[in-house]
UniProtKB/Swiss-Prot annotation:
GO BP: any one term: protein import
Disulfide bonds: none
Organism: Guillardia theta
Function recorded in the entry: Has a central role in coupling the hydrolysis of ATP to the transfer of proteins across the thylakoid membrane.
One Gene Ontology term, aspect cellular component: chloroplast thylakoid membrane
Family, similarity comment: Belongs to the SecA family.
Gene: secA
Keywords (A to Z) from UniProt: ATP-binding, Chloroplast, Membrane, Nucleotide-binding, Plastid, Protein transport, Thylakoid, Translocase, Translocation, Transport
Protein name per UniProt: Protein translocase subunit SecA
A Pfam short name: SecA_DEAD
Length: 877
């Protein structure tokens, strides 16, 4: 009704952009007349105009028109009007919701080029290394064509490589690499160790995945800590003796466990009448984690075991998270459960949440196919407005109502039946599962049915073929099982992805990869053999495949960017022949798949978040293609079991519905959506609470990191140490004069101890001085003592005092910050109990965290001054 009266609010937000798009379109004919070199000269012209105070808004239509023309010449892809709208939304620091297949990667070119002209560096963030490399090599060619430099950050890169790539105009990286580099930079002991520039503008691809799904997991750099391995083993043994619903209760919504009185007594008896809550030797955290490991964290669902290690599986993407560990002893508890080596518990050296990390960017924007359901959170926490970009073609996908079965058996049997029917029909099917275990269960069923299929989950043997499997999931009769959204970022094209097949064939012709996926085609097809002969006459293949630039050149060969490189020109000619071959080969197949109804997506369980369900559905019906989706559910599914599953079961029993027959009802769909909204609200509250608490630490983090950076950037830190000493001395004197039972002798003794002096001050003389005169007198002595200490140390080696100052400052800041993080963690874990005393835990946390921080800063000052004045370097012979 409101939409009828006032119009669609999203449409109102989009309308102003349409006027700018008209201006961009008007400039298209003019730019088409420019030669390549004239088009490339536009960049230098824009930079000069911007440096002469021309505004981005004035130049924006021409800048976007230039990028569109460059994209057409380099990639053969021209931005549609809706893609221009997406680019305008991003430039305004908002989130552009664009459906799957609408060309988000191409859209990001527009704002990244415009903002890179300022010279401060732009970051394009993706969810994995593969997508970062793909985008930098593909659309990065447009930036290079226009004269900008393109960088890429990948796992395993050296410090030098990282610094060089961050200096580029546009840098592609994953969210985790960016975050960890930021933390490492703020642990650096030399300016040369810092790799990042100050942040400027950032575009996040799959922004909902990074800012919502990963917001609960902070980035942590850890060091070795003390962990009693025997406690994890003993707690695991005890947990096996405890009985669910008698000794402990499970809160599945909160993913938490609660020990009953009976359970506490049982644990204490098993431990020899030990109080499990004893603060000096606590057992409770170990037992709680052991029960969580037993009940809430399951192999092939939440983790896999690889090389005797527990590897986390991302519950949202189905990908393995190498190098990541659960904190607070949970990972060790799972290691004890699975009888694999228990790694030492670590101590946090530096940490930050993605929420606070991305808020460091003065200008932030993002793209995704699914953000509307989370727009409240994105606005409240990040200040990011969500705008929905219209699709280029009308969406044709049909989303069928869910089918709900009484048992898991009935559900999986029906899914397998549907896969068989679709396969026999020739229609491609994509089945999304929620875990490794369930993907393998369905795979076993399909094998029994004789249905050929591809399996993609977190297991290493499947991950290696990820892009290939997803790219070919639209082939005639293809059946693909994928865990959640593994493979996200690679489009499923009806009839098959010809460009992917052509590139794979080119790689096979060069023998770049040992394992060929289409080697039979190549071996038996005369045209392919002719192409191989052609390559051999033009290239030294062995030299080429050993060239470090091999992959980059292959990427360039598969694009349309200008090049003088003879090797790339040769490979591009072969690639074009392969493209034409596969397009001709697959064109009838594409038409056939379209006529059958396109890709059919099957969901095997409703996720806790509607977004994840929408992402799965969004694989079908891209760019106006036909498609459909359907979810098959069971009353045993987690979401239904936790929320209202028993009520639906009663209805099915009352109606005497057979186990093999499903319920299909819009009312039930609404009930499920309501359950999902409850879960989403719960997790939003958890993320908001995390943000509120981490914001307190964030202010402290920024203060410490600012101080550290200034220390690294300052050549002479003498004034720094003296300022620390003055502040400490002034505090001692203030304390002396403010106390009723003042003790001047004790005050002077503290100052003498701080400065490494023995019986230096005359108490009788000092007692005759007023507050200000006493300060001036002691600070005067401080400067004399410091000059003497500097002369003494510089006798050993000229300039040694400066090195000691920096070393002591960084050493004490880092060690104190590490201890502070530990204290903050303990405070955070215990503060919740204040709520039972009618106190607001957050306010209590803020007050106590502030006091801890003030004490830490005071301790740093005192310790640094003490170390400098007590240092006694030894003269070398």
């Amino acid at each position: 009704m409101l939409n009828v009266l006032f119009g669609d609010p999203n449409e109102r937000r989009i309308n102003p952009y349409k006027q700018i798009v008209n201006k961009i379109n008007y400039l298209e004919a003019k730019l088409k007349k420019l030669t390549d070199s004239e088009l490339q000269e536009q960049t230098e012209r824009f930079i000069k105009l911007l440096s002469n105070n021309s505004s981005n808004e004035e130049l924006l239509p021409e800048i976007y028109a230039t990028v569109r023309e460059a994209s057409l010449r380099v990639l053969g892809l021209r931005h549609f009007d809706v893609q221009l709208i997406g680019g305008l939304i991003l430039n305004d620091g908002k989130i552009a919701e664009m459906k799957t297949g609408e060309g988000k990667t191409l859209v990001a070119l527009l704002p990244t080029y415009l903002n890179a002209l300022a010279g401060f560096g732009v970051h394009v963030v993706t969810v994995n290394d593969y997508l970062a490399r793909r985008d930098s090599e593909w659309v990065g060619q447009v930036h290079k064509f226009l004269g900008l430099t393109v960088g890429l950050i990948q796992e395993g890169m050296s410090q030098f490589e990282r610094r060089e790539n961050y200096l580029k105009d546009v840098t592609y990286a994953t969210n985790s690499e960016l975050g960890f580099d930021y933390l490492r930079d703020n642990m650096a002991i030399d300016l040369e160790d810092i790799v990042q520039r100050p942040f400027y503008f950032c575009v996040i691809d799959e922004v909902d995945s990074i800012l919502i799904d990963e917001a609960r997991t902070p980035l942590i750099i850890s060091g070795p800590g003390n962990s009693p391995v025997n406690k994890y083993i003993k707690a695991n043994v005890i947990s096996q003796d405890l009985i669910k619903d008698i000794d402990y209760e499970i809160d599945e919504k909160a993913r938490n466990v609660i020990l009953t009185d009976n359970g506490i007594l049982k644990c204490e008896n098993l431990l020899g009448n030990t109080d499990i809550f004893n603060l000096q030797d606590p057992w409770a955290p170990y037992i709680f984690n052991a029960i969580k490991a037993k009940e809430l964290f399951l192999e092939n669902i939440h983790y896999i075991i690889r090389n005797q290690e527990i590897v986390i599986v991302d519950e949202f993407t189905g990908r393995i998270m190498s190098g990541r560990r659960w904190s607070d002893g949970l990972h060790q508890a799972i290691e004890a459960k699975e009888s694999v080596p228990i790694q030492s518990e670590t101590q946090t050296l530096a940490s930050i949440t993605y929420q606070n990390f991305f808020l460091l960017y003065p200008k932030l924007s993002g793209m995704t196919g699914t953000a509307k359901t989370e727009e409240t959170e994105l606005d409240r926490i990040y200040g990011l407005e969500v705008n929905c970009v219209p699709t280029h073609k009308i969406m044709q996908r049909v989303d069928f109502p869910d089918l709900i079965y009484k048992t898991q058996y009935s559900k999986w049997k029906s899914i397998a039946d549907e896969c068989l029917d679709m396969h026999n029909l020739g229609r491609p099917v994509l089945i999304g599962t929620t875990s490794v275990e369930k993907s393998e269960l369905l795979s076993s069923l399909l094998k029994e049915y004789g249905v050929p299929h591809n399996l993609l989950n977190a297991k290493p043997e499947n991950v290696q073929r990820e892009a290939e499997i997803v790219a070919q999931a639209g082939r005639l009769g293809a059946v693909t099982i994928a865990t959640n959204m593994a493979g996200r970022g690679t489009d499923i094209l009806l009839g098959g992805n010809t460009s992917y097949m052509a590139r794979t064939a080119l790689i096979d012709l060069l023998h770049v990869n040992d394992a060929s996926t289409i080697s039979t085609d190549i071996a038996t097809n005369v045209d392919f053999l002719k192409l191989k002969t052609f390559i051999q006459t033009k290239l030294d293949i062995e030299t080429f495949i050993n060239d470090p630039q091999c992959n980059l050149k292959l990427g360039l060969a598969c694009e349309k960017s200008f090049t003088n490189d003879e090797q790339i020109i040769t490979l591009r000619a072969v690639y074009q022949v392969l493209i034409e071959y596969y397009e001709k080969l697959l064109s009838p197949e594409k038409l056939r798949v379209q006529s059958l109804g396109g890709l059919h997506v099957i969901g095997t369980e409703r996720h806790e978040s509607r977004r994840i369900d929408n992402q799965l559905r969004g694989r079908a019906g891209r760019q106006g293609d036909p498609g459909s989706s359907r979810f098959f559910l069971s009353l045993d599914d987690n979401l239904l079991r936790i929320f209202n599953g028993d009520k639906i079961a009663k209805i099915m029993d009352q109606l005497q519905i057979d186990e093999d027959l499903p319920i299909e009802s819009k009312l039930l769909n609404s009930s499920l959506e309501s359950a999902q909204k409850k879960v989403e609200a719960y997790y939003y509250d958890a993320r908001k609470q995390l943000f509120d608490y981490d914001e307190v630490l964030n202010y402290q983090r920024q203060a410490i990191y600012f101080e550290r950076r200034k220390i690294l950037e300052t050549n002479n830190l003498r004034s720094w140490i003296l300022q620390y000493a003055e502040t400490t001395i002034e505090q001692y004197i203030e304390d002396y004069f403010s106390k009723e039972a003042n003790n001047l002798e004790a005050c002077l003794a503290n100052i003498e101890f701080l400065l490494g002096l023995n019986n230096f001050f005359d108490v009788i003389y000092c007692s005759t001085l007023n507050r200000n005169d006493l300060k001036q007198f002691i600070i005067q002595q401080l400067y004399i003592a410091y000059d003497l200490k500097e002369s003494q140390i510089d006798l050993i080696e000229t300039g040694l005092m400066r090195e000691l100052e920096r070393s002591f400052l960084l050493q004490k800041i880092d060690s104190s910050w590490k201890e502070h993080l530990q204290q903050i963690t303990i405070l955070r874990e215990s503060i919740g109990w204040r709520g039972y005393g009618q106190k607001d835990p957050l306010i209590e946390y803020k007050n106590e965290a502030f006091n801890l921080f003030v004490n830490m800063v005071s301790k740093i000052r005192q310790s640094v001054v003490y170390l400098v004045f007590r240092s006694q370097p030894i003269l070398k012979n």
